[in-house]
């Protein structure tokens, strides 16, 4: 009778498997695999080698605290002639004496998470059990049988593997790209993502069921949506929008997700202060990409927050056009969420592909502050019954805006306002390029098209179906040159009278600082004039906006809202026009000193010229970049920076990975907040 088979050690082939599974950056000390794909391991036996005729090898793989075969969290499988795609299986690749090379495969629908892999050997009546090791299983966009399969290699690289990108801010007429370090493969981030799953309320309520449901990207996406904010749980970020961030970090100051997730994990899942929509979206993007779900950050300009699902945002104003009060139903200058790519077997065919997921805490969904995933195609078709939260997202891109003027006798009169259209310039980063891609067409049919009317009919969007009132008089706000922070500049109310009659009017122009979520600040410019509109004429009325007026009240959004109200007393009519202005920050210049080589020190020289007429104090540069810095670095400048002078610092980098990387920079001082810059750096082999 053959002696018992004894395992000496197991080599999980971490580096080789990491290369094959596109997880090399995660496979420093642990095995990270993508489901539905073969992987290798090597068994070293002592005494004698494996003999197929007398030895039986049985493998076990378990995940979660209470694994079971019924829940899909426990599997037992034996050696077979070849691995079976789509199931737990193992086969022999090669044997050299006491060394056995094996190939294993996981199902394409296995729950993601940490697994324990074991081996049982049996020879006749003898048997032993061995612990082979642990591995982490992720979703697999390269596997056709996986629910997150994406058939474009360029898109897989962009939406799963790329660790840097851009988030779009500013205003619809001045879109600003902000660099961001997602850093999903940086040290400790995968552990933070797995911890996020393990402290979510659904896991704490029913651990076995939660682990089982982690097979579905729909479920995982919804969990991540709820856990990135901390409104119901031990989530990552605390939101704040009142411009008081003294006991934390301003949302505008962040330049990446890595520092946020590390802080959350290292402080025992305590909320990180503070986030706003793009920070919530960026952190969700990092987590979902890390777990293997193709994801991108999306920005919607003129985004509606409709609380009562009537697809209508109503503003009540006094006779001067001023809002009676700030309210919760508002139009945000822009709003960010993420889209993740997946199939939707729970929905009708055609609703697979990009799914909107919004982690910013706005409204509760099934009792939790989360939103989505909802099919972007369902939004485009106006199918508001679709899971999850279709009506809320539809309103974000389609709600109508009605302005009411409350007159002196208390009655209200509807004002014409053709300047504000909800859901414009929906933007995301292009695949493989540092450019913006407009994806509005994926959410909406062309304005005025028959398809658009069909969608509004299906969604019972009655206000959008009503005919727009035309008076023959039109007004829009135009801008001049030089809209940079620190400058005085002009804006213009451009008024056209396309009728044969003369019009006696009063024009009230007002400029106020504004936060990106629509909350107004103090006035920084006004004009009140009477004018006559001659028949078939055009008029351009200027409003001068001075730096000394806006400098003390501009928020970190760098936004000013200009409103024009044209009143025609004889006709008792009001015409409203608005425009949001983004004031450009000064440019951050980045020079790379030395030859960029792997595992060799590199120096970045970072500078900024003071554009203001005053000195800058308390200047701080903060830099980070996946593959360039192990952690975020900050450099303080003790001396004041006089007007017109440049402030310059040097930062040491240590590139660990070859290829293209982004160095992301933030600059703060007493008068300039959250100035961003970046530099692409190509790292060559040592």
Swiss-Prot record:
Modified residues (N6-acetyllysine): 468
Primary localisation category: cytoplasm
UniProt site (Important for catalytic activity): 516
Induction pattern: By retinoic acid. Up-regulated during pregnancy.
Reactions listed under catalytic activity: L-glutaminyl-[protein] + L-lysyl-[protein] = [protein]-L-lysyl-N(6)-5-L-glutamyl-[protein] + NH4(+); L-glutaminyl-[protein] + serotonin = 5-serotonyl-L-glutamyl-[protein] + NH4(+); L-glutaminyl-[protein] + dopamine = 5-dopaminyl-L-glutamyl-[protein] + NH4(+); L-glutaminyl-[protein] + histamine = 5-histaminyl-L-glutamyl-[protein] + NH4(+)
Disulfide bridge positions per record: 230-370, 370-371
Cross-referenced InterPro entries: Ig-like_fold (IPR013783), Ig_E-set (IPR014756), Papain-like_cys_pep_sf (IPR038765), Transglutaminase (IPR050779), Transglutaminase-like (IPR002931), Transglutaminase-like_sf (IPR036985), Transglutaminase_animal (IPR023608), Transglutaminase_AS (IPR013808)
Highest taxon, organism lineage: Eukaryota
Regulation of protein activity: Acyltransferase activity is regulated by the binding of GTP and Ca(2+): inactivated by GTP, which stabilizes its closed structure, thereby obstructing the accessibility of substrates to the active sites. In contrast, Ca(2+) acts as a cofactor by inducing conformational change to the active open form. In absence of Ca(2+), Mg(2+) may bind Ca(2+)-binding sites, promoting GTP-binding and subsequent inhibition of the acyltransferase activity. Extracellularly reduced and activated by CLIC3.
A Pfam family this chain is assigned to: Transglut_N
Changes after translation: Disulfide bond formation inactivates the calcium-dependent acyltransferase activity. Cys-370 can form disulfide bonds with both Cys-230 and Cys-371: formation of a disulfide bond between Cys-230 and Cys-370 facilitates formation of the disulfide between Cy-370 and Cys-371, which promotes inactivation of the acyltransferase activity. May also form interchain disulfids between Cys-230 and Cys-370. Ca(2+) protects against disulfide bond formation and inactivation.
Subcellular location: Cytoplasm, Cytosol; Nucleus; Chromosome; Secreted, Extracellular space, Extracellular matrix
Active site: 277, 335, 358
UniProt cross-references to Gene3D superfamilies, sorted A to Z: Immunoglobulins, Transglutaminase-like
Record: residues binding Ca(2+): 398, 400, 437, 447, 452, 538
Known function: Calcium-dependent acyltransferase that catalyzes the formation of covalent bonds between peptide-bound glutamine and various primary amines, such as gamma-amino group of peptide-bound lysine, or mono- and polyamines, thereby producing cross-linked or aminated proteins, respectively. Involved in many biological processes, such as bone development, angiogenesis, wound healing, cellular differentiation, chromatin modification and apoptosis.
Oligomer status and interactors: Monomer. Interacts with phospholipase C; promoting alpha-1 adrenergic receptor signaling. Interacts with PLCD1.
Family per similarity comment: Belongs to the transglutaminase superfamily. Transglutaminase family.
Protein name as it appears in the record: Protein-glutamine gamma-glutamyltransferase 2
Name of the gene: Tgm2
């Amino acid at each position: 009778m053959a002696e018992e088979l004894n395992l000496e050690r197991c080599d999980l082939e971490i580096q080789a498997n990491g290369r094959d599974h596109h997880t090399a950056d995660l496979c420093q000390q642990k095995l990270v695999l993508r489901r539905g794909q073969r992987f290798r391991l090597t068994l070293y036996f002592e005494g004698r080698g494996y003999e197929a005729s007398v030895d039986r090898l049985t493998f076990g793989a378990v995940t979660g605290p209470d694994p079971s075969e019924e829940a899909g969290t426990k599997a037992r499988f034996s050696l077979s002639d070849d691995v079976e795609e789509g199931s737990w299986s193992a086969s022999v690749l090669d044997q050299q004496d006491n060394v056995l090379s094996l190939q294993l495969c996981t199902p394409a629908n296995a729950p993601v998470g940490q697994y324990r892999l074991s081996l049982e050997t049996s020879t006749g009546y003898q048997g032993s059990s061995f612990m082979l090791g642990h591995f982490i299983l992720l979703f697999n966009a390269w596997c056709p049988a996986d629910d997150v399969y994406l058939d474009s290699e360029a898109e897989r690289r962009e939406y799963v593997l790329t660790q840097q990108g851009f988030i779009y801010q500013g205003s619809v007429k001045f879109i600003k790209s902000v660099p961001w370090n997602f850093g999903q493969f940086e040290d400790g981030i995968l552990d933070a993502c797995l911890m996020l799953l393990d402290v979510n309320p659904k896991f704490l309520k029913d651990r076995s069921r939660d682990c089982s449901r982690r097979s579905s990207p729909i479920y995982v996406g919804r969990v991540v949506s709820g856990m990135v904010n901390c409104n119901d749980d031990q989530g990552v970020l605390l939101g704040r929008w009142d411009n008081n961030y003294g006991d934390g970090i301003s949302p505008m100051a962040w330049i990446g997700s890595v520092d946020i997730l590390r802080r959350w994990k290292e402080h025992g899942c305590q909320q990180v202060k503070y986030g706003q929509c793009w920070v919530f979206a960026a952190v969700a993007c990092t987590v979902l990409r890390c777990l293997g779900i193709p994801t991108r950050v999306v920005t919607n300009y003129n985004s509606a927050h409709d609380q009562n699902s009537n697809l209508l945002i109503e503003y009540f104003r006094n006779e001067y056009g001023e809002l009676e009060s700030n309210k919760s139903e508002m139009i945000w200058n822009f709003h960010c969420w993420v889209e993740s790519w997946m199939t939707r077997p729970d929905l009708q065919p055609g609703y697979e592909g990009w799914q909107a997921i919004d982690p910013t805490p706005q409204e509760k969904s099934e009792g939790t502050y989360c939103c989505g995933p909802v099919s972007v195609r369902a939004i485009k078709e106006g199918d508001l019954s679709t899971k999850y939260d279709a009506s809320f997202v539809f309103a974000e891109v389609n709600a109508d805006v009605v302005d009411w003027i409350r007159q002196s006798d208390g009655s209200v009169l509807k004002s014409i306002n053709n300047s504000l259209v909800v859901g414009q310039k929906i933007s995301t980063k292009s695949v493989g390029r540092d450019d913006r891609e407009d994806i509005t067409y994926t959410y909406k049919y062309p304005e005025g098209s028959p398809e658009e009317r069909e969608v509004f009919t299906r969604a019972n969007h009655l206000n959008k179906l009503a005919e727009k009132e035309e008076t023959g008089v039109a007004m829009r706000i135009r801008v001049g040159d030089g809209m940079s922070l620190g400058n005085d500049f002009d804006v213009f109310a451009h008024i056209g009278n396309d009728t044969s009659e003369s019009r006696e009017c009063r024009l009230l122009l007002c400029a106020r600082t504004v936060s990106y979520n629509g909350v107004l600040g103090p006035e920084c410019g006004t004009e009140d004039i009477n004018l006559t509109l001659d028949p078939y004429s055009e008029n351009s009325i200027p409003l001068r906006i001075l730096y000394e007026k806006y400098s003390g009240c501009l928020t970190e959004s760098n936004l000013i809202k200009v409103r024009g109200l044209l009143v025609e007393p004889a006709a008792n009519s009001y015409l409203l026009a608005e425009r949001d202005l983004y004031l450009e920050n000064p440019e951050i210049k980045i020079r790379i000193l030395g030859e960029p080589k792997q595992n060799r020190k590199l120096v970045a020289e970072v500078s900024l010229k003071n554009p203001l007429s005053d000195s800058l104090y308390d200047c701080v540069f903060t830099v980070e970049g996946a593959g360039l810095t192990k952690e975020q670095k900050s450099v303080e400048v003790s001396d004041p920076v006089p007007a017109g002078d440049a402030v310059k610092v040097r930062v040491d980098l240590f590139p660990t990975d070859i290829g293209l990387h982004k160095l992301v920079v933030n600059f703060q001082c007493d008068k300039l907040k959250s100035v961003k810059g970046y530099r692409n750096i190509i790292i060559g082999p040592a």
